[in-house]
Each structure stands twice: as C-alpha cells, then as structure tokens.
Amino acid sequence: MRDLILNALLAHYEGQIKMAKANVEIFLENAAGVGEHNDILETIDVEIAKIADAEDKIDVVLKHLKIANPRI
C-alpha cells in the first residue's frame, strides 16, 4: 500500500511536469494566440516554476522515502 501511494504521488508530479511543459510549448509556438496572457515571459516563468516544484517533490520522495519500485 505504501509503494502504491508513493507511486501515485510520483505519477501525479510527472503529470504536472508534462502539463507545464505542454503549456510552455503552446506559449512558445503561439504566443499571439493566447490573448489572456499579456506578459508571456511571466506566464512561461510560472509554468517553469511548476516544473521545478514537481521535480523537487519527486527528488524528496526518492531521496527521503523508501520506495521499493519507483515507477518513473
């Protein structure tokens, strides 16, 4: 059960990274088409912060919590 929960967290963090990466790619490819985002640099910075946060959480789980079979 423990590994199931920790792997679910890891999958959640990986999903957050993928979503943020997709958003960055969309903003980079079609910045003009995203009308509600006036400051594209700030918007991309927010997405990069989401990636950094999720990566930090993955690192903490892998470093500090023993997990038999991490699925990442």
Question: What is each model feature region?
Answer:
Residues M1-I72:
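Extended, charge-rich alpha-helical interface modules
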